[in-house]
C-alpha cells in the first residue's frame, strides 16, 4: 500500500516517516490551513528528503507564477491540486514541468466519477477526500461505499484516516492504491512520531 503522510511542519517527524518507508510527504501551501508552511519553510524541510519519495506541495488555486516559484525554490517533485483548478490549467503545468508528478484531490460526492473522467488523462494519482467548502483537511471520514464504483483508477483514500479506519477499509475490498493521512498521525494537532511509526509499520509489514 502507498502511504502519503501530509501536513508536516518539523524535520523530526519527517525523518521518522522517511525511516519507516513512507511513500509521499506532503506540505500544505494553503495559508488558511493550520498546517500551512511557507515556500522558505518547504525549502528547508524538503532538502534532505530522498527524491525516491514523492515530495508533495499541496496547492489551492495558485497561479502559474506561484507554482514556478515553488518548483524553482524547493525540492518538491509532486504537486497536489486541492482547489478548483481546471483541466486545462493542470495540462499547462504538466506540459511545462513533465518531470513533476501530479496528484488531484476530489471530493467524494455525486460528481466524483464525472470529475475523475475529466482529469484522468493528466493526473498520476487521485485523492478521494471528504467534501468540504474549505478545500479538505477536515479530519472526518465519508461514506466509503462510493469507492465501489472506482476501477482501474489510481487513488488514495483520504479523510480522517488512522490505523483503526485502515483496518475497517481492509475488509471492504476496494481497488485503492493506499492512504493519505494527516490528523491520524497527530496528537493535539502536532505530528506524533510514535503514531507515524506505528501506522507505517502496520501498513508496510
Describe the residue ranges of each PLM region.
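Conserved N-terminal beta1-alpha1 strand-loop-helix module at the mouth
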Residues: 1-205
Amino acid at each position: 500500500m502507498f502511504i502519503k503522510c501530509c501536513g508536516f511542519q518539523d524535520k523530526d517527524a519527517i525523518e521518522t516517516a522517511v525511516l519507516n518507508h513512507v511513500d509521499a510527504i506532503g506540505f500544505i501551501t494553503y495559508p488558511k490551513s493550520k498546517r500551512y508552511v511557507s515556500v522558505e519553510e518547504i525549502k528547508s524541510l524538503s532538502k534532505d528528503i530522498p527524491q525516491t519519495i514523492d515530495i508533495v506541495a499541496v496547492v489551492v488555486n495558485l497561479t502559474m507564477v506561484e507554482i514556478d516559484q515553488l518548483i524553482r525554490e524547493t525540492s518538491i517533485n509532486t504537486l497536489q491540486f486541492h482547489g478548483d483548478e481546471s483541466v486545462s490549467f493542470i495540462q499547462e503545468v504538466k506540459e511545462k514541468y513533465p518531470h513533476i508528478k501530479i496528484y488531484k484531490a476530489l471530493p467524494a460526492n455525486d460528481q466524483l466519477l464525472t470529475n475523475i473522467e475529466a482529469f484522468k488523462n493528466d493526473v498520476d494519482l487521485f485523492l478521494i477526500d471528504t467534501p468540504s467548502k474549505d478545500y479538505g483537511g477536515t479530519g472526518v471520514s465519508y461514506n466509503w461505499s462510493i469507492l465501489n464504483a472506482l476501477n482501474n483508477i489510481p487513488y488514495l483514500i483520504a479523510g480522517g484516516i488512522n490505523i483503526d479506519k485502515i483496518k475497517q477499509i481492509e475488509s471492504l475490498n476496494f481497488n485503492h492504491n493506499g492512504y493519505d493521512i494527516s490528523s491520524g498521525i497527530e496528537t493535539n494537532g502536532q505530528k506524533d512520531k510514535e503514531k507515524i511509526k506505528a501506522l507505517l509499520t502496520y501498513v508496510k509489514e
